[in-house]
């Protein structure tokens, strides 16, 4: 394979593979009954042992006994109190225990593995110690930025991100010098597998192996194959951590095959849609009425930033063009634009230079832009889990938000029924008089 050749890139269509319906929280790895704490289920070998700290709600990050440099960075970021998932996972994870964690969008899962791995890391020049994999380029880029944010007082820590759609030669050049060789690698499975296979990236010193949005990678056969090959290139005694907002009963045993007696953490009952502070509505209308209704909503609603989801790259481009012609400050992010342009647009939106983003499901998972407080499903997704990930872009980390879904076909009505059944909610119709902005504006 030539180094310049673009490798496997997982497109929007592949991301639409329907997730299996999730059930209630599983029992522990040893078959022990799970330990329930409110809406938090904890199980696994460490859950009931003294000294594991599980269930002790720390009042601050200092209680985790993290490195001083990390605590300084956390303070700089303005974080005061850990989220529920951080309180449960971090004290056990820093003891080198494997972790399988499912928690809804916006609860701070990324910080769990970023802080844990940075705390444990002792950088050695020319050695990669931490490997983090995710299923899209945008998420890889964002995770790399999180590492940069929290390692600002750790000057010896080098982080690199590798994904398909960019020239492989650049990656090889970075890996060929001890001065630039990263101690932390973040990337997508296709590109990482190629670098390992071509012996450009060595994984023999890996101490932590992390999968973010693990169900998406282990659900799809070709991605799972890449993950397995990469896993086999790492040492047997590493720590394995996996995270996702949705973990079906079918996927959990697959995850646990990579692990040794993991701590299992499932926040909130799987069947409940609990995005706290997020108002959700639907609007019934014909396909031809969507543009007019969207225009009305963007004109009448107050919002900081809005993300509008559509079902294809072509529709994303067309809707973005239409919005710009109507003088709305819009941008489109989907797999139909070049990687360089995609990252540029993502940064433009994240830095608040644009307030409206039209996107496909490639933007539906894990992307964390705190100013988004309105999500519109111009096209309803194909399944309930995709709906959860999409609307979770608004109302991140406990803030308020508003989600509106257009329902225009019989198939949409079926998906709406599935959402209501899956999450045991009854989504109301959008009120004719609109919604008071104080209900969703922080």
From Swiss-Prot:
Motif position, Q motif: 59-87
EC numbers: 3.6.4.13
Binding site for ATP: 103-110
UniProt-annotated location(s): Nucleus
PROSITE patterns associated with the record: HELICASE_ATP_BIND_1, HELICASE_CTER, Q_MOTIF
Subcellular location, principal: nucleus
InterPro entries assigned: DEAD/DEAH_box_helicase_dom, Helicase_ATP-bd, Helicase_C-like, P-loop_NTPase, RNA_helicase_DEAD_Q_motif
Superkingdom, taxonomy of origin: Eukaryota
Sequence motif: DECD box, positions: 212-215
Domain (Helicase C-terminal) ranges: 293-438
GO MF terms held by the record: ATP binding; ATP hydrolysis activity; RNA binding; RNA helicase activity
Record function comment: ATP-binding RNA helicase involved in transcription elongation and required for the export of mRNA out of the nucleus. SUB2 also plays a role in pre-mRNA splicing and spliceosome assembly. May be involved in rDNA and telomeric silencing, and maintenance of genome integrity.
Designated name of the protein: ATP-dependent RNA helicase SUB2
